Amino acid sequence: MGRGGLASAAPLLLYPRYEVFPTRTVEQAVVEWVPRDMTVTVTASPGKGLEATLDLTERLCAHGYRVVPHLSARLVLDDAHLAEIVARLGACGVDDVFVPGGDVDRPAGRFDSALSLLVSLDQMGHPFSRIGITGYPESHSRIVDDVTIQAMWDKRRYATYIVSNLCLNPAVVRRWIARVRARGVTLPIFIGMTGPLDRARLVNMAAKAGVTDSARFLATHTGWLVRLGIPHGYRPERFLDRVGAALAAPASAVEGLHLFTFNQVRQAEQWRRSLVQRLADPQDPPRAESAP
């Protein structure tokens, strides 16, 4: 592959969003490696609950970051609980949230979907200026395609942007962007991807998340875990080279990159800095490896 696709993606590498899990050590890693003008998103899980997400959000806000917490709908109890969350986030200056349904079989309260929580936020008077929703380039492991497609259509009026779920196949990502636009959904998109990942550390991190969260993580990410484990299965520069032109096309309306760090924050930022520097240096162009 040549440099064209990578060069097209270069502007998106300047200010990607970094997604992290709320763990004991991740705050230090973010503060040490992530520039203060970057956006950090904080996930929510059934095992840790929303409190861990909100706590890390508050601490990262205090460090000067723009933070986007995940408000998983099925972890919110009711409208009173939602109002408390909104007030707490408002107090630390959060104006952007990401609203997934939440990977939990039984809702904790009355919200059974992202749409139901989005409607309640709307009825509260739009307390956040930006709201993100999920897009699925590949089929969801537990939801049929027709449902996810309809859900995006239903949620689009309450959201301001889409974040694509992690997909390591550039051809699938390109086709998905085209399909979203063909359906008349015009929200800007952040494309989900990873930097280089240590597969062993990734599985170990999943194990530390607890039995339930770990089993769900490994079950829902089997495909790209396998891809990470084979030689030349996934290389982030090759991925960007193959999607770069599509991301840069005005019709795609891609706003940025969303880096799933899986808390390998240092590796992600070192990779990003190195690639940005090489793309800016015509004497040292990065090479995207070809497929085996």
Model-derived segments and their meaning:
Residues 76-79, 105-113, 164-177, 199, ...:
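Active-site glycine- and acidic-residue-rich loops that bind
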